[in-house]
């Protein structure tokens, strides 16, 4: 579940978004929907303070940590959404910091970015949860593939890295060709379709 919103510019809004996630996780737990992977939450760091002018990184990290604590108490997980390319390094840094206490925190990576195959290699370790998507933001050619076929080829390269790794790859696509390739790679690497 993803509470939509991004690029918060006020601390009160960042904290309100955090509190919305905390209430959501409590409600999911009360309804019995958070256990055994039935529901998880995804969060955009810019929605919880990443770009605030004063201490944005620290505020986003503290807010994400509070959401992770609530998710752990509810028996579910959190995935950090990826936003435009300007947030990638900061998102991966927060991910590293959160995983010190919450090793199950996942991350989204976007195949249309030139850097993503290398990011997949870095994230494919044991216990790592990685959701691969194509990407939805308008990005310049200097950082992202512009041709749909190039994006798809990158998606497949990233899938190969993630499926061969020791982590938990999550496939985010509506494309029947990519889903079939994902099934074949999962089978090749002895993965089950959970």
What is the meaning of each model-derived region?
Residues 2-194:
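Positively charged, amphipathic and often flexible ligand-engagement surfaces
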